[in-house]
Swiss-Prot record:
The lineage of its organism: Bacteria, Pseudomonadati, Campylobacterota, Epsilonproteobacteria, Campylobacterales. It comes from the Bacteria. Belongs to the universal ribosomal protein uL6 family. It comes from Campylobacter lari (strain RM2100 / D67 / ATCC BAA-1060). InterPro entries: Ribosomal_uL6-like, Ribosomal_uL6-like_a/b-dom_sf, Ribosomal_uL6_a/b-dom, Ribosomal_uL6_bac-type, Ribosomal_uL6_CS. One of its GO terms (molecular function) is structural constituent of ribosome. Part of the 50S ribosomal subunit. GO terms for cellular component: cytosolic large ribosomal subunit. Keywords: Ribonucleoprotein, Ribosomal protein, RNA-binding, rRNA-binding. GO terms for biological process: cytoplasmic translation. This protein binds to the 23S rRNA, and is important in its secondary structure. It is located near the subunit interface in the base of the L7/L12 stalk, and near the tRNA binding site of the peptidyltransferase center. This is Large ribosomal subunit protein uL6. Gene3D superfamilies: Ribosomal protein L6, alpha-beta domain. Transmembrane segments: none annotated.
Length: 178
């Protein structure tokens, strides 16, 4: 029994939800999202809540039940509040700057790295912090992971790009024989 799937998803004021066949359509202002359940779960909209139930009693149906409920919750949170991830840049000479829709990173390579910002994502740079914001949780996480991938933090000095919540396990360097 899915503990997540059986919880109803509340529809906040200002968010419109429509069910057209297997397609859930969400709208708030000029932002619109869609979720196709592909007929894997039963969906009902009652009294300002979205209710999910499994199609069958098999393991796969129960797995989809919780998954689609979580995806729906993330879409609603994304439309109302949005998601953000903060990255920190540590290292001498490591910098980030915004130039239009391109994030320019100087991460100790012989050349700057230019990262084209995807549609629907807003990036702000504040000294050594890069803040990635957007309404789609998956895209925000993917963009943050791609930026981190350019120079992941190394364990000896901690130089590189890391999430603000990430803790780097440090290693001791070589000890010299005397």
């Amino acid at each position: 029994m899915s503990r997540i799937g059986k919880q109803p998803v509340a529809i906040p004021s200002g968010v419109e939800v429509k069910l057209e066949g297997n397609l859930l359509k969400f709208k708030k202002g000029n932002l619109a999202k869609e979720l196709d359940t592909k007929a894997n779960v039963n969906v009902e909209i009652k009294e300002g809540q979205i209710l999910f139930s499994p199609k069958g009693e098999d393991r796969q149906s129960r797995a989809y039940w919780g998954t689609y409920r979580a995806l729906t919750q993330n879409i609603i949170i994304g439309l109302t509040d949005g998601f953000s991830k903060t990255l920190e840049i540590n290292g001498v000479g490591y910098k980030a700057a915004l130039k239009g829709k391109v994030l320019e990173l100087a991460l100790g390579f012989s050349h700057p790295i230019n990262y084209a910002i995807p549609e629907g994502i807003e990036i702000t740079v504040d000294k050594n912090n890069i803040i990635v914001k957007g309404s789609d949780k998956q895209v925000v996480g993917q963009v943050a992971a791609q930026i981190r991938e350019f120079r992941p933090p190394e364990p000896y000095k901690g130089k590189g790009v890391k999430y603000s919540t990430e803790r780097i396990i440090r290693k001791a360097g070589k000890t010299s024989k005397k």
